[in-house]
């Protein structure tokens, strides 16, 4: 175990997957977390849990959807090992598509806000010339499907944005850009969905996420067998694909 403290800023720190990722990190090495999100009480509860696990924690109550929110000042004066962007939303597609304002909000939550934050964090990593930026995407972005194409399209956009940023830093090997692609995960965001054998626990996905971050993987399907499933779905001929109810 390394004795040097690992500094991580977590955006959307109330995410169930992010919480388990931080727990896995704290179990492996000394850590300092800056937890950011809107729900102050929930952030403090998470911070106290992590402190009991030996981590140092600071909390910043911010609205990550507000482009005028000055959260960047909380990052000044420190050298960051990890920026972890974890906020997102899984909308009811039919209801959301019926409301043009709701469509814009979901695109903001799942793509525009993460992309904006990634841009700021990337400039910090460029100044440092090292560090990791990890963002939670989804297997839903691999192919547009009738059941969730609104959500999936935002995650596809996020994947493309992340890939481009990774290309930007290809000449700086000490900077890692990691896209985490969970499959169906048992979290509060999926509480209303019927659970099946393809669901994984947030704890399992969070631990796998930390492993991928630690290794600096470019793209990580969580669990890895989702790559097989999505590879099949991606390569289904259109005529066959359109006969499915995916």
Please annotate each region the language model reported.
Residues 14-15:
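Conserved glycine-rich cofactor-binding loop
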Residues 29-45:
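Conserved glycine-rich Rossmann-like NAD(P)H-binding loop of the short-chain dehydrogenase/reductase
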Residues 88-104, 147:
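Conserved mid-core segment of classical short-chain dehydrogenase/reductases
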Residues 118, 154:
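Active-site helix of classical SDR
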Residues 138:
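Residue(s) in the substrate-gating loop at a strand-loop-helix junction
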Residues 143-149:
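Active-site loop immediately N-terminal to the catalytic Tyr-X3-Lys motif
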Residues 179, 194-231, 238:
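C-terminal helical subdomain
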């Amino acid at each position: 175990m390394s004795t040097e403290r690992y500094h991580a800023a977590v955006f959307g720190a109330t995410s169930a997957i992010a919480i388990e990722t931080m727990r896995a990190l704290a179990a492996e090495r000394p850590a300092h977390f800056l937890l950011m999100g809107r729900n102050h009480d929930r952030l403090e509860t998470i911070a106290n849990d992590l402190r009991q696990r030996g981590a140092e924690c600071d909390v910043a109550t911010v609205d990550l959807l507000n482009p005028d929110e000055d959260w960047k000042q909380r990052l000044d004066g420190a050298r960051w090992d990890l920026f972890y962007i974890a906020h997102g939303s899984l909308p009811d597609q039919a209801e959301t598509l019926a409301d043009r304002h709701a469509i814009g909000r979901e695109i903001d939550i799942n793509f525009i806000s993460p992309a904006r934050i990634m841009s700021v964090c990337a400039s910090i990593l460029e100044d440092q010339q090292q560090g990791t930026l990890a963002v939670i995407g989804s297997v839903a972005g691999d192919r547009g499907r009738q059941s969730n194409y609104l959500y999936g399209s935002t995650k596809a956009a996020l994947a493309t944005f992340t890939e481009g940023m990774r290309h930007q830093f290809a000449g700086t090997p000490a900077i890692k850009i990691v896209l985490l692609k969970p499959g169906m995960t048992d979290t509060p965001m999926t509480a209303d969905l019927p659970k099946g054998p393809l669901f994984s626990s947030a704890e399992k996905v969070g631990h796998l996420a930390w492993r991928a971050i630690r290794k600096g993987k470019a793209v990580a399907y969580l669990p890895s067998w989702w790559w097989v499933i999505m590879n099949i779905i991606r390569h289904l001929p259109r005529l066959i694909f359109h006969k499915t109810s995916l």
